[in-house]
Amino acid sequence: MNTFQMRDKLKERLSHLDVDFKFNREEETLRIYRTDNNKGITIKLNAIVAKYEDKKEKIVDEIVYYVDEAIAQMADKTLESISSSQIMPVIRATSFDKKTKQGVPFIYDEHTAETAVYYAVDLGKSYRLIDESMLEDLKLTEQQIREMSLFNVRKLSNSYTTDEVKGNIFYFINSNDGYDASRILNTAFLNEIEAQCQGEMLVAVPHQDVLIIADIRNKTGYDVMAHLTMEFFTKGLVPITSLSFGYKQGHLEPIFILGKNNKQKRDPNVIQRLEANRRKFDKDK
């Protein structure tokens, strides 16, 4: 399976939609957009082809479902009936688009040197990222959106599974509600896990649909965490970052792990970006 074959397969599977397609050969992307308002999404075909080797038609089914829901929610309609309980935060990489395809700025905040917080209207099976043009219809200010979203993410269930590897404890939050990574914003939940940790606590959001927390009690644990984050990062439909974060008393510090059985390393470049963010936050306060 190559990108051209995947392009054709997706176009065939999505032929029931009233959409047009635009293929970018250089970037190996396929833009799928509505014919009535030109709103749409762009899919990275090379990433899907890479996953196809392992997941076969399952990954195609996932993409088709995702596109179906996204295109349906992009229909022009009123937002006045949206309730405050539908405002949610979503985590994205700092490289994520800052504006819509129409050039309208999204509502977002910096989070760490590797992550940013965007805000969305929950629509059941999907959600719509909030941009500046939606504020008037929502009758909300940016600050109200921030407060509502944090309140709502704290109300989510934080059920998790655990696994022990070589004496290290790993917690997996994977409810597939679209907000697993968003739970990194629930400081009370993270503090609850921190109180149980006997070693160093690491947190990771490799993609949108998982939050990994680790109680690292020996050197092997760092290697396991590095492997887990990279594996999840490469398989996620909405990847965020392959880096882990050290967590202590409400503070997140991006780290990465070098070499087998080596303790975590603080990357000077990452720290420089993080410090730049901190200075900006302090200035804005």
Curated annotation (Swiss-Prot):
Protein family membership: Belongs to the UPF0354 family.
Name this polypeptide is given: UPF0354 protein SACOL1793
